[in-house]
């Protein structure tokens, strides 16, 4: 639960209706999940409970995110912008679904036309920091919706021994690339190794975010030694 320090609320600039936009961001991989509105009441409720509450403009009442779907948002931190009129909520998304459509993020509709930079760099039209999380979502989708001739599906079908054998092979190739100090090969072999590790995680029903959470906790413990 977040500490009940509410002094910062006085610095916020709510609009004429007493509302302020709040953007929810995954606290582990930085993915933008959704945007909704808050007022002082919903913000105070969020701080007290540690679970995000918004203000529903259509229903004109508090909206406890996840109260019907079970996809609660656990508050991890709050920032607000230089004008103090937009908030960024760092949250843990329960169930990995923020959108009412069932998508992880509400921001899944992409505009790709008439944007020169996208045409020149179409491979990198999204944050690279999200790539591993997105890759794991693809692996999960392949598991739920098998596709013909899918390498991922063949690994999952063949099972643990095949997956672990591939991890051993890719690990050895990564070591050899490092010994040769071949930067391109190191990058390629590291990518192969990460992919096969993620397949193993999925096979054993371990979420990628569980790994990220372990890393985050280790980083926090090292930066805040007892």
From Swiss-Prot:
Residues forming coiled coils: none
Residue numbers spanned by region Phosphoribosyl-ATP pyrophosphohydrolase: 132-226
GO biological process, one term: L-histidine biosynthetic process
Reaction(s) catalysed (UniProt annotation): 1-(5-phospho-beta-D-ribosyl)-ATP + H2O = 1-(5-phospho-beta-D-ribosyl)-5'-AMP + diphosphate + H(+); 1-(5-phospho-beta-D-ribosyl)-5'-AMP + H2O = 1-(5-phospho-beta-D-ribosyl)-5-[(5-phospho-beta-D-ribosylamino)methylideneamino]imidazole-4-carboxamide
The protein's annotated pathway: Amino-acid biosynthesis; L-histidine biosynthesis; L-histidine from 5-phospho-alpha-D-ribose 1-diphosphate: step 2/9; Amino-acid biosynthesis; L-histidine biosynthesis; L-histidine from 5-phospho-alpha-D-ribose 1-diphosphate: step 3/9
Cell location: Cytoplasm
Gene Ontology cellular-component annotations: cytoplasm
Keyword Nucleotide-binding on entry: yes
Annotated keywords: Amino-acid biosynthesis, ATP-binding, Cytoplasm, Histidine biosynthesis, Hydrolase, Multifunctional enzyme, Nucleotide-binding
EC number(s) given by UniProt: 3.5.4.19, 3.6.1.31
One Pfam family hit: PRA-CH
UniProt keyword annotation of Endoplasmic reticulum present: no
Region listing for Phosphoribosyl-AMP cyclohydrolase, in residue ranges: 1-131
Family: In the N-terminal section; belongs to the PRA-CH family. In the C-terminal section; belongs to the PRA-PH family.
NCBIfam families the record matches: histidine_hisI, PRK00051.1, PRK02759.1
Name this protein carries in UniProt: Histidine biosynthesis bifunctional protein HisIE
Organism annotation: Prochlorococcus marinus (strain SARG / CCMP1375 / SS120)
């Amino acid at each position: 639960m977040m500490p009940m320090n509410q002094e910062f609320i006085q610095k916020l600039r709510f609009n004429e209706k007493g509302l302020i936009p709040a953007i929810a961001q995954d606290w582990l991989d930085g993915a933008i999940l959704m945007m909704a509105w808050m007022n002082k009441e919903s913000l105070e409720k969020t701080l007290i409970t540690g679970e995000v509450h918004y203000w529903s403009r259509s229903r004109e009442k508090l909206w406890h995110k996840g109260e019907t779907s079970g996809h609660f948002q656990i508050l991890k931190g709050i920032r607000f912008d230089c004008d103090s009129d937009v908030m960024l909520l760092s949250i843990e998304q329960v169930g990995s679904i923020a959108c009412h459509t069932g998508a992880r993020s509400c921001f899944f509709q992409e505009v790709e036309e008439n944007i020169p930079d996208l045409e020149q760099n179409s491979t990198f039209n999204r944050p690279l920091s999200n790539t591993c999380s997105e890759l794991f979502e693809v692996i999960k989708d392949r598991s739920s919706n098998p596709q013909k001739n899918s390498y991922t599906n063949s690994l999952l079908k063949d099972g643990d021994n095949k997956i672990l054998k591939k991890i051993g092979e890719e690990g050895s190739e990564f070591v050899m690339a490092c010994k040769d100090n071949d930067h391109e090969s190191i990058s390629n072999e590291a990518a192969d190794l990460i992919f096969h590790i993620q397949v193993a995680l999925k096979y054993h029903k371990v979420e990628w975010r569980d790994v990220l959470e372990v890393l985050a906790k280790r980083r926090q413990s090292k930066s805040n030694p007892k």
